[in-house]
Amino acid sequence: EPYRRQRQMCIRDRYEGRAHSILEYTDQAFVLNGFSKRFAMTGLRLGYLIAPKSCMRSLQKLQQNLFICASSVAQQAGIAALRQAEPDVERMKQVYDERRRYMIARLREMGFEIKVEPQGAFYIFADAHKFTTDSYRFAFDVLEHAHVGITPGVDFGTGGEGYVRFSYANSLENIREGLDRISRYLSRPGS
């Protein structure tokens, strides 16, 4: 409702249902996106902006003064992704959804609270207050003792303290192993 009053709308990627675009609703929208997650093209630093025609020249001036350009390799890969990769994207979504569901269940079994289940991307922001009030120290201890990297919630601002972020952008086998290690670490006396 607050977004409607300000004539704003937010649409995000989801695992279920048809993908939507703000451009279905208006031609006065700005769409900023990249190829990293959707097409698994991390590191190529390729993105795009769709904007109203009336804003294009100003945006071109801004772009020309802030960025050099995407490499020709990244540009060609992006073109190929747009033309051919949709079946692969759908398969990846199914794989990520399987990993997401598995990780959510395991984290809850271990005692982490997940207040909002992720619907896109490949991260879970879990409440770790049961284990710590210092997410930085907790993430460091998990790395040192379980040899698994997680991100302290405080890295996302003070409101993230007591939370940690897990990634499921790895194989299910490695996710299982990592969660097994964390589980063993948490069940040790004094952890």
PLM feature segments, named:
Residues L23-E24, L46-K53, R83:
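Short beta-strand-to-turn element immediately C-terminal to the catalytic PLP-Schiff-base lysine
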Residues I79, Q94-I104, K115-A128, G160:
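Conserved glycine-rich beta-strand-loop-beta hairpin in the small C-terminal domain of fold type I
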Residues T132-D134, D141-T151, F156-S191:
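PLP-dependent enzyme catalytic core of the Aspartate aminotransferase-like
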Residues R12-M41, K53-S54:
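Active-site pre-lysine segment of PLP-dependent enzymes
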Residues E1-R7, I11:
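Single conserved hydrophobic/aromatic residue that forms the stacking wall/gate
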Residues L59-Q63, A81-A105:
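Structural signature of PLP-dependent enzymes
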Residues A40, K53-S58, P87-D88, F131-T132:
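Short helix-loop capping/hinge motifs at secondary-structure junctions, enriched
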